[in-house]
A protein has these predicted regions:
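Amphipathic, Lys/Arg-enriched alpha-helical "gate/interface" segment within cytosolic domains
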Residues: 1-127
């Protein structure tokens, strides 16, 4: 399976795991809609954690950032998102995440960590 989305059973976290066979051009809209549905159904704000197990090209990073961070219905501006945490070792994604805090992307608050344990620890501090 190219990606997996799960709502934590007890904590207010949604985890998207992006596997190496994920095709952003074909699957981003699908995974975004699934996460949006979970957020719509939530009675409390969620920490949205994305675990990148794949390598993204610069074009994919730019396309992805524009699709999730800009526009009226952008997922990362959903009112039920408390914080976004990215798990990656990619320097390009790390720099892109910093850019998401700009006015162009609506001043998003995106953290980048290196492991799932670190992401869960950070998310639990916010809960």
């Amino acid at each position: 399976m190219s990606h997996h989305i799960e709502k934590h059973p007890t904590d207010p976290f949604i985890l998207l795991t992006v596997n190496p066979d994920y095709n952003m051009a074909e699957e981003l809209a699908i995974s975004n809609q699934t996460v949006a549905n979970l957020l719509d159904q939530s009675s409390e704000k969620q920490v949205y954690i994305i675990h990148f197990k794949n390598k993204l090209s610069l074009d994919e990073i730019i396309t992805g950032a524009n699709r999730v961070g800009r526009g009226e219905n952008s997922l990362w501006h959903h009112p039920n998102i408390k914080k976004i945490i990215l798990i990656t070792n990619s320097a390009a994604i790390r720099v892109s995440a910093q850019g998401m805090s700009s006015d162009t992307f609506g001043n998003l608050n995106v953290a980048v960590v290196a492991s799932l344990d670190e992401a869960l620890h950070h998310a639990r501090q916010l809960a």
